[in-house]
Amino acid sequence: MLGEQIGSGQGKRTSRRVVAVEPVFKVEVSFEEMDKMLGIEGMNIGTYTSSPRPDGTLAGEGQGVFATLDGQTATWKGIGTGQLKPGGAVSYRGCLTYSTTAPKLARLNLIAGVFEFEVDATGNTQTKVWEWK
């Protein structure tokens, strides 16, 4: 069951590159967002790769770091499924795990997050994360 929303952010895709073409193509994407996690403002920087599946959906996995404005950090890893949308937009749904030694963010070590990640046709990103109870 979904619990409370624990995070949200908006930002921009910062790079894209093809990292494989066989047996199917794989694209690596990086992004930066100004986020709020557990009510704490900071920056989220992430990179994910995605490849098409036979049915046309996307399989993706990624990793990144959330840094509070005072320098405390938490890393994350995620996996998800996505779909291409008109104009090159992409929509993903998936789950996240976290790791941190930062006192402010320690609760993340006990959380599995469920996310929505949207990238519009111009590269603007939007993320929402809920606690999975």
Named regions from a protein language model:
Residues 1-133:
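Beta-strand-enriched cores of mature, soluble protein domains
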